[in-house]
Amino acid sequence: MDEVENINTWLKFKDEINSDKTLQKKINKGFKCLFYGPPGTGKTLSASLIGKKNNMDVYRIDLSQIISKYVGETEKNLSRLFDLAENKNWILFFDEAESLFSKRTSVGDSKDKFANQQTAFLLQRIEDYNGLVILATNLKPNIDRAFTRRIQSTINFPIPTINERKI
């Protein structure tokens, strides 16, 4: 996949890219990509292989440890995660991303308002992260367009053919 090789190339040169003042004015921080396709098509495996090839840890986000029913706690958890990831140089892997990056709704009650605030906060943190963020989903249409507009690479993982499965 050429798209995956583009990710590897970015990782190889990310320090130079992130430290170049001229480039900083022209391009977004970090690299964001979306892996989408049916279950079992290699999205998680590909994220792991990207990490292995680049000698980087892939941190799979456990949504149960991030999302909280208490107001403001989800944002605190996300802040801790992103601060730690910056220091550790992790690849952040959001599996089943549609559950956290879903389309925002019109505000009907306070619950909708807080959900939309969480989405906006997450959008800002991802935008400011100078490393690699991979979102993986089986439900691409459910991802908020504000996220998809900021993604540099969108990679489809189709069901492999019989011949591809033998490889």
Kindly give the residue locations of the regions a language model identified.
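Walker A/P-loop NTP-binding motif of AAA+ ATPase domains
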Residues: 2-167
